[in-house]
Curated annotation (Swiss-Prot):
A motif (RCR-3) lies at residues 211-215. It comes from Human bocavirus 2 (HBoV2). A motif (RCR-2) lies at residues 115-117. Residues 606-776 are annotated as: Transactivation. Residues 193-197 are annotated as: Ori-binding. The endonuclease active site can probably bind other divalent cations. Its EC number is 3.1.21.-, 3.6.4.12. This is Initiator protein NS1. In the N-terminus, the endonuclease region is involved in binding to the origin of replication. In the middle, there are the ATPase and helicase activities. The C-terminus probably contains a transactivation domain. The keyword Oxidoreductase does not apply. One of its GO terms (cellular component) is host cell nucleus.
Length: 776
């Protein structure tokens, strides 16, 4: 018999409310999978519940089923997992296994997701860390659910559909430990004057009274509330439902719910009679108010905006809310508001003024890097990122380049305020530069054709793009100020000169930007100061035509990973990469010894030191796991029960902030090649260190025994060869060599020779047999 939770009379402060969603989209259509995974043994009862009659009809079978499913259905299991995870989180905050806190968890069946409301309060949780704790809470909940699934795995192997849900829970858990919640957990927040969101403390008892308790019971989307709720516990005006409620570890039973609510209203939460009404009761006569007189004042009344000004204010709010930066964005996002403003006198100029004000506001609030993250939040770096691959092809460490770009875009690189991509055509210069500036979106371009106003488009911008930069003596002096991040005044057409703040510059060119052209002379006087302001990357390798364009999202993924991992300042960059001075020519990358590839095999992830792709294993059988077989569609029920697959190839393919472990490359003997032993040098090169697991130990013992057999049989073969008489063999002529190679001369003159067989069928010689096993 379950004990019902007593009425909670005081709740620990501060208190916050979370909502955790079950990360499976099609759970309603495949509800039977949740029965078998989370609540095995309840399938028959849940099916019988569908056929039960709703109240007020008497159905004894319905009462027995609901009594049997009291806290055994999957909604109750989900609520228990959330309660255990929240208790663990508060224990971490208070650094004790027995935290002093109050926790209320209620699972509900929503219109889209199965979710759980969590009310938690106690020491260690504050407005500053409650929002950050979402990822930790999600990871703990997913860990509890996967542990519940493993209990079923001890009894029987998973079905393919069950294995998909299990691996989905494991993936969400790994992403949560990396800081990515994926909108699977939320917290009640409020927005301040600057538009930032913060965690909102709540009154937990009133939240419990008005939102949590007055709901009817529903434990399955295929059933109805009037079937799952008894008539005595029915809330007439309630239109929302719940599945299971836990208060401080004890379940709140259905028949105690109304009594709990009544006691909470009458005794715990103060009613109107106890509120401050100046000593009077709630329904007594209000105090009399004396005669009020208006005080005459000479002060002017508040100003009321006219229609045109209200339209401008509304448009400015829309630009801030939807990140509208150019006229085309206004046309696509709010055409009605744009038409109303265009209809006003001087409407086109008013729209330009509104966009200009919004640009000033964005430039004052963000840097190019923070605005890029604002437009592309919570991006996860994957190994098939084209920006990563391009930098590897050009010989650079992509993580080091990303670190430098973060410092420049965040205005933390000192005097080096410019990144220049230099090289011949079709090497990816413009591709990379365009992805950066399009990711920021608020950028200006330098126009050589308008020689009097070259930097006319660079004011009120987060970043400047100088495509095919060419340095001329007419603008070399303001260019040095802009490239170095120094404030200067620039000329604007039809306006006075304006002040240009520090703005990062991206250059893509195949010209020598350090040579200043003027008339018929070329000067190198400005080369040294220009090199001190520019960080140059030389792209010299041409890309294939099928490489594709780098998207702004891929740039955001790379920069966000670097921003989270490194200190994006000049000091942090120099300390991380052991540099005394950041040179003009960016240093090339130094790949790890095992990461020298052709940058094609990227499924194993990337190295967090050199940025190169992790090598693949030559023995596919050793590193085959359940997750890869499940996603490819070849499901083996025997292998689905192997929980070791969660740490193998599936984790390596899902690249997050925790890179995959490096593996030893062990070559397997090709099936078509003859059985031959490894050579001693190849064997020693391969096994320079001890085997790290059972598979490598097995391969090591096989190769060692084969090498020992070859060593013993070598003297016997030499003696047999010395005993046989050697006959002189004539040297073959070109025709004989052609027959050995599988090429015979044609019978008809003038026709090409006939190829009899392929070179792949030739048996390897004795000298090459030792190279087939044990080495790459």
């Amino acid at each position: 018999m379950a004990f019902s939770a007593p009425v909670i009379r005081a709740f620990s402060q501060p208190a916050f409310t979370y909502v955790v969603k079950f990360p499976y989209e099609n759970w309603k259509e495949e509800e039977h999978l949740l029965w078998s995974l989370l609540a095995p043994g309840t399938e028959r009862l849940m099916i019988q519940l569908r056929n039960c009659a709703p109240h007020p009809e008497d159905d004894p079978v319905r009462e027995d089923i609901l009594c049997s499913l009291a806290d055994q259905h999957y909604g109750a299991i989900f609520a228990k997992a959330c309660y255990i995870a929240t208790t663990t989180l508060m224990g971490q905050k208070q650094r004790t296994p027995f935290p002093r806190c109050d926790i209320i968890c209620q699972s509900e069946i929503g219109s889209e997701h199965l979710h759980c409301h969590i009310l938690v309060g106690g020491a260690g949780l504050s407005k500053r860390n409650a929002k950050i704790s979402r990822a930790t809470l999600l990871g703990l909940v997913m860990a509890e659910l996967t542990q519940r699934c493993k209990q079923l795995l001890a009894l029987r192997p998973f079905e393919p559909a069950e294995a998909n849900i299990f691996h989905l829970l494991k993936r969400i858990e790994r992403e949560a430990w990396s800081g990515h919640t994926g909108n699977w957990v939320q917290i009640l927040q409020y927005k301040d004057k600057r538009g930032d969101l913060h965690a909102q403390p709540i009154d937990p008892l009133r939240f419990l009274k008005h939102y949590i308790l007055p709901k009817n019971r529903l434990i399955s989307p295929s059933s109805k509330p009037d079937v799952c709720t008894t008539p005595d516990n029915w809330f007439i005006l309630a239109d929302k439902t719940y599945a299971h409620t836990i208060i401080n570890g004890l379940p709140l039973l259905e028949h105690n719910r109304k009594a709990y609510l009544q006691e909470l209203e009458s005794e715990v939460i103060p009613g109107p009679s106890t509120m401050a009404f100046g000593g009077r009761g709630a329904w007594e006569q209000l105090p009399e108010v004396g005669e009020q007189r208006l005080i005459t004042s000479n002060a002017s009344t508040a100003y009321k905006a006219n229609k045109k000004e209200k339209l401008m204010l509304n448009l400015l709010d829309k630009c801030d809310e939807l990140n509208l930066l150019v006229y085309e964005d206004l046309v696509s996002a709010c055409p009605d508001l744009l038409l109303m403003l265009e209809g006003q006198p001087g409407g086109a100029r008013l729209i330009e003024q509104v966009l200009g004000m919004h640009h000033i506001k964005v430039c004052a609030k963000y840097t190019a890097l923070t605005f890029l993250f604002h437009l592309h939040p919570d991006q996860l770096l994957t190994s098939n990122n084209k920006a990563l691959k391009l930098l590897l092809i050009q010989g650079y460490n992509p993580l080091q380049v990303g670190h430098a770009i973060c410092c420049v875009l965040n205005k933390q690189m000192g005097k080096q305020n410019t990144i220049c991509f230099y090289g011949p055509a079709s090497t990816g210069k413009t591709n990379f530069a365009k992805a950066i500036v399009q990711g920021v979106r608020l950028y200006g371009c330098v126009n050589h054709l308008n020689k009097g106003f070259v930097f006319n488009d660079c004011r009120q911008r987060l970043i400047i793009w100088w495509e095919e930069c060419l340095m001329h003596q007419d603008w070399v002096e303001p260019a040095k100020c802009i490239l170095g991040g120094t404030e200067c005044r620039i000329d604007v057409k039809h306006k006075d000169s304006v002040l240009l703040q520090q703005t990062p510059v991206i250059i893509s060119t195949n010209h020598d930007i350090y040579s200043v052209v003027g008339g018929n002379t070329v000067s190198h006087v400005h080369a040294a100061p220009l090199k001190e302001r520019v960080l140059q990357l030389n792209f010299m390798k041409q890309l294939p035509q099928t490489f594709g364009e780098i998207s702004p999202v891929e740039i955001a993924e790379l920069l966000q990973w670097c921003f989270n991992e490194y200190e994006c300042t000049l000091t942090g960059f120099k300390q991380k990469w052991n540099l005394d001075k950041v040179p003009n020519s960016f240093p090339l990358g130094d790949l790890c010894p095992t990461h020298s590839q052709d940058y094609t095999l990227h499924e194993n992830g990337f190295c967090t030191d050199c940025g190169g792709y992790l090598p693949h294993s030559a023995d596919d059988f050793v590193y085959t796991d359940v997750a890869s077989e499940t996603t490819s569609g070849d499901c083996d029920p025997g292998n689905l029960g192997d929980t070791d697959g969660e740490d193998s190839k599936s984790e390596a393919s899902e690249v997050d902030f925790r890179p995959s472990k490096k593996r030893r490359v062990i070559s397997a003997t090709p099936p078509s090649s003859p059985v031959s032993g490894p050579s001693l040098s190849t064997f020693l090169d391969t096994w320079q260190s001890q085997p790290r697991d059972e598979d490598e130990l097995r391969i090591y013992e096989e190769q060692a025994s084969q090498l020992q057999k070859n060593t013993k049989s070598t003297p016997e073969r030499e003696e047999a060869q010395l005993g046989e008489p050697q006959e002189p063999q004539p040297e073959p002529d070109p025709t004989a060599w052609g027959e050995k190679l599988g090429v015979c001369s044609s019978q008809q003159p003038g026709e090409p020779p006939v190829v009899l067989y392929c070179f792949e069928d030739l048996r390897p010689s004795d000298e090459d047999e030792g190279e087939n096993i044990g080495g790459e």
